[in-house]
């Protein structure tokens, strides 16, 4: 089998990885089934409007997975379990599977890792996460990523596989912590966008990041994650990035909520998947079961349900009972 890679999902992140990793492989197969993606691929322009390298090939059918021993899934989280079910008939003992999808499986209402183990109980999956805007990765801007798996060989394999001169990889055994960070930061980015839309300043943004990190850590700890994970790349690093720049669709969505007061119009204006909105209900459901307080995430939920205005949410957060800074 040649040194090939299959990336499932030709959106922004899948396209970025195919562009950034082209020199590591003989051929990169980019799997898609939508006519819009096929048209872009035929014109050699990615979802990021950046030309694909010569060795990135469109794959119409999943049988092409047989030509690659390494697979990276980059579909939105709501499609993750469906993709796993579709690829299962094509997977053999030589394949190694990772995913760059962030969020929870909202279809099965569980971690992506749990969905993976449900369908592939005898395999060790791997998540690729960290502060990484797709557009900057495609432009070869220096970026650091976390590669997490409970299996040391699996995480080391993918860490070496995707490292380049501009992609630096770090390994982590705490796959649950990495997935919690990648999910919760999207909700907090919506909150940051709301604050930006309300014309609040850097003080507010800093407070949101710091207190949001506390919410993320509390939830992760209740699920067995390590606190150290949340002060690393997949926690604090990704949170700062996603809350600070409008390359984040979640942040733009928060701004649009303030400007439009309408979820449907906000989503149209953002023009892409808003993972924070998709996973919000599930995250809060888990938090309630674990009796974990997540006031910022809760206020984002109330806003998206039309129960309160953004300004009312801020007033509530500012008037909560006083707490110690380490809580």
From Swiss-Prot:
Location in or out of the cell: Cytoplasm
Any matching Pfam family: NAD_Gly3P_dh_C
InterPro entries reported in the protein's UniProt record: 6-PGluconate_DH-like_C_sf, 6PGD_dom2, G3P_DH_NAD-dep, G3P_DH_NAD-dep_C, G3P_DH_NAD-dep_N, NAD(P)-bd_dom_sf
Pathway involvement of the protein, from the record: Membrane lipid metabolism; glycerophospholipid metabolism
Annotated catalysed reactions: sn-glycerol 3-phosphate + NAD(+) = dihydroxyacetone phosphate + NADH + H(+); sn-glycerol 3-phosphate + NADP(+) = dihydroxyacetone phosphate + NADPH + H(+)
Keywords, comma-separated and alphabetical: Cytoplasm, Lipid biosynthesis, Lipid metabolism, NAD, NADP, Nucleotide-binding, Oxidoreductase, Phospholipid biosynthesis, Phospholipid metabolism
Entries under Gene3D superfamilies matching the protein: N-(1-d-carboxylethyl)-l-norvaline Dehydrogenase, domain 2, NAD(P)-binding Rossmann-like Domain
Domain of life: Bacteria
SUPFAM superfamilies found in the cross-reference section: 6-phosphogluconate dehydrogenase C-terminal domain-like, NAD(P)-binding Rossmann-fold domains
A single cellular component GO annotation: cytosol
PROSITE patterns for this protein: NAD_G3PDH
Binding residues for NADPH: 13, 33, 102, 134, 249, 275
Residues binding sn-glycerol 3-phosphate, per UniProt: 102, 130, 132, 185, 238, 248-250
Enzyme Commission number(s) of this protein: 1.1.1.94
GO biological process, one term: glycerol-3-phosphate catabolic process
Molecular function terms from GO: glycerol-3-phosphate dehydrogenase [NAD(P)+] activity; NAD binding
Active-site residues annotated for this sequence: 185 (proton acceptor)
Homology family: Belongs to the NAD-dependent glycerol-3-phosphate dehydrogenase family.
NCBIfam families (alphabetical): PRK00094.1-2, PRK00094.1-4
Function, in words: Catalyzes the reduction of the glycolytic intermediate dihydroxyacetone phosphate (DHAP) to sn-glycerol 3-phosphate (G3P), the key precursor for phospholipid synthesis.
Name of the protein described by the UniProt record: Glycerol-3-phosphate dehydrogenase [NAD(P)+]
Species in which this protein is naturally found: Vesicomyosocius okutanii subsp. Calyptogena okutanii (strain HA)
